[in-house]
Curated annotation (Swiss-Prot):
The gene is 52. This is Gene 52 protein. It comes from the Viruses. It comes from Mycobacterium phage L5 (Mycobacteriophage L5).
């Protein structure tokens, strides 16, 4: 069974992001996993709701 510190994950995209959550002092350059750090495009695509332009402006038929 593998874990996030296993060498198998070295160099994989995003592996340092998860490692930084466990050992932030070893990966100080990685931002915390928070919505404030997401691009507007990613927020619209993966979160939706209030992050999507025009949300809440629906008109009744």
């Amino acid at each position: 069974m593998h874990n996030i510190l296993d060498p198998t994950f070295n160099g994989m995209p995003g592996s340092e992001l998860y490692r930084a959550e466990v050992f932030p002092e070893l990966f100080p350059h990685q931002p915390p996993m928070r919505l404030e750090n997401w691009s507007q495009e990613d927020l619209e695509l993966y979160v939706g709701g209030c992050f999507t332009p025009g949300y809440g402006e629906r008109k009744s038929a």
